[in-house]
Amino acid sequence: MAAKSDGAAAVAGPGPEGPAGADRGGAGGRGEAAAGIAGPGPVEAGCPGPRYELRDCCWVLCALLVFFSDGATDLWLAASYYLQGQSTYFGLTLLFVLLPSLVVQLLSFRWFVYDYSEPAGTPGPAVSTKDSDIVGAAISTKDSAVAFRTKEGSAELVPRPAPSSAGTYRRRCCRLCVWLLQTLVHLLQLGQVWRYLRALYLGLQSRWRGERLRRHFYWQMLFESADVSMLRLLETFLRSAPQLVLQLSLLVHRGREPELLTALSISASLVSLAWTLASYQKVLRDSRDDKRPLSYKGAVVQVLWHLFTIAARTLAFALFASVYKLYFGIFIVAHWCIMTFWVIQGETDFCMSKWEEIIYNMVVGIIYIFCWFNVKEGRSRRRVTLYYCIVLLENAALTGFWYSSRNFSTDFYSLILVCVVASSFALGIFFMCVYYCLLHPNGPMLGPQAPGCIFPEAPGPCGPPADAITSPPRSLPRTTGTERDGVAVGGERAGTPTLPVFQVRPGLPPTPVARPLRTEGPVIRIDLPRKKYPAWDAHFIDRRLRKTILALEYSSPATPRLQYRSMGTSQELLEYETTV
């Protein structure tokens, strides 16, 4: 979740049809191959890009409903504890609401400050292009400054012309109003609500506007969705997860039927955790054009998967904590340390700096206390199996220790709780298997893999085609004059025409395909290797790159394409283009 690129450069150059030598090669002058990426979503060149649909709008509205229900029930429960005179429960409940919210609002406001700040001495990040063939224009992201260098005789990338005094005054007033509004929104702890509404607005604008503005608004919508998904992931595991364990522990400790308000708070926290995890994975896949998007069916099944596994996990925690409070704290700290070390040992590559990567790994360690979260590239089947085997053993041990120290007058009640833990975990594993076997974007886990984004069909077996001649050529006898004149050879009737040795198969005439005229836009070469899934691309977590890309995309009449520096071996497809 970094905001800096440590001086990485983004270079805008010509497309594949531009001058020779500019379409291949390394970014930053290192002579290394460049990995191509362009905009959100895999689409064919010349075809319309992904559109914002009604179900996308409904998904955002449901996310807002989950957010408000979680916060409102927690605050309502804290007020109930206060009115009942239970100051300890009131303080703990309010602490788990306010402290994570303050942390997330500070991070969100920091992102806003960077996004809306202007470098000294420049009119802002907005730029314009005279033509679409931009040759040699370099955009540096060092120290948040945007500099432009062009070759002589080429199309020029120029800053926006200086506004008049009246325009400057109006612009400053607008900026002041935006700053005051954002400050008020974040003081009211509504930064995420603002980002949800803005993502909804940008998505609707991308549907209603023309082609060029549609792409621009769609990019902005994806950036805003990525921001709010990261913020929600951080907040839910700092607020909803501890709140869920606390309320369940109090419920088990009292040994009576739950009140309606307590049950609502527990349910809202549980749904918030499951929803945030599924929403994060969906936005992450939607943002990468090298991965197939996650369908809404898969997202709903992911919600059910995490809902039941987290419910079993937190109930086991609550049962154990209701009897062994000190040992429960030791267990949580030990589990967090082991999981954090496991994540660090996997050498994740999510952030732009070392210290931010360490902080991120610590947050992932907190997530691993409750549920599975993929942080490493490649097939995760073994890691998922190992993790849930450990969780199963821990849940059984925690529940067993609590059951051994139970009150024997409530045997039936204790047996019901044990069955709830076991059945909830089994249901969660069932929905996980349904997701991986039927609804995974890459295809069934045990069946054939679905076609990828770059290759529409699965590659066939290596070797020559069926019509190819695999045997080496043999020497043919010389054709005599008699044979050329049609004389029978080997008993055939004279005058019978012989078939030619080589034949050309008649083929259908090529059908002319009407291709829409399109202008090649700038190629933005980023002097960084592209991060591998499940990490975010650098232009999503580095806000300098984001500002530069949005400025070029808005000013260019064609879709800009991004190229990351490739650290691996050369591939057949070094550049591929998608429409935003």
Swiss-Prot record:
In the UniProt record, does the keyword Transmembrane helix occur? yes
**Residue segments, region Disordered:** 1-35, 470-492
Q: How does it sit in the membrane?
A: Multi-pass membrane protein
Q: Which cysteines does the record link by disulfide bonds?
A: none
Keyword flag Transmembrane helix: yes
Tell me the Pfam families matching this sequence: XK-related (PF09815)
- The gene is Xkr7
Assigned protein family:
Belongs to the XK family.
GO CC, sorted alphabetically, is: plasma membrane
The record's subcellular location field reads:
Cell membrane
Q: Where are the transmembrane segments?
A: 59-79, 89-109, 260-280, 303-323, 326-346, 355-375, 384-404, 415-435
| Listed name of the protein | XK-related protein 7
- Family annotation (InterPro entries): XK-rel, XK-related_scramblase
